[in-house]
């Protein structure tokens, strides 16, 4: 998938790569933070010993720095986007040409996944969309009782689909 970067993005990526030695695949930013998606296996170099590279980058850019390790495996990439929050399950459903990712989390972690006014989930959709063609990420809050309650063949249980739509509707209000 081709990513369009503006001049500011290119300069920011170049500077971060020089500071850390990590290969950056993509970067996005907002008023609060800068997110760098680094090549699989480069997360250690990006963080640096004792988090030194992240601290230096935070000082240099004047914003909080988030790092995400890229993965060709979409489910692993989604887990990496939300790390360190542990996702109980991730599954993908294709609707026509659109990929929709569903993530199941413990009910207590739902707010952390979605973020204040949906910022975290919006950022995740933006990054997953740019790099993996994901159109939407839906959060399903529920406890996983056993390994067999995961939808078969990436099918979505009706109750899970309904609750994930309700979660997004609640957050958009």
Swiss-Prot record:
Cellular-component GO terms for this entry: cytosol
PROSITE patterns reported for this sequence: KH_TYPE_1 (PS50084)
Region: Disordered, residue numbers: 147-173
Pfam families per record: KH_5
Entry keywords, A to Z: Cytoplasm, RNA-binding, Transcription, Transcription regulation, Transcription termination
GO BP annotations listed: DNA-templated transcription termination; transcription antitermination
Domain KH: 31-97
Domain of life from the UniProt record: Archaea
One GO MF term attached to the UniProt entry: RNA binding
Record field: compositional bias (Basic and acidic residues): 147-162
InterPro entries recorded: KH_dom (IPR004087), KH_dom-like_a/b (IPR015946), KH_dom_NusA-like (IPR025249), KH_sf_prok-type (IPR009019), NusA_arc (IPR010212), NusA_bac (IPR030842)
CDD domains tied to this protein: KH-II_NusA_arch_rpt1 (cd22530), KH-II_NusA_arch_rpt2 (cd22531)
UniProt-annotated location(s): Cytoplasm
Chain intervals with Polar residues compositional bias: 163-173
Main location: cytoplasm
HAMAP family found in the cross-reference section: NusA_A (MF_00945_A)
Task of the protein: Participates in transcription termination.
Protein family according to the UniProt entry: Belongs to the NusA family.
Protein name, as recorded: Probable transcription termination protein NusA
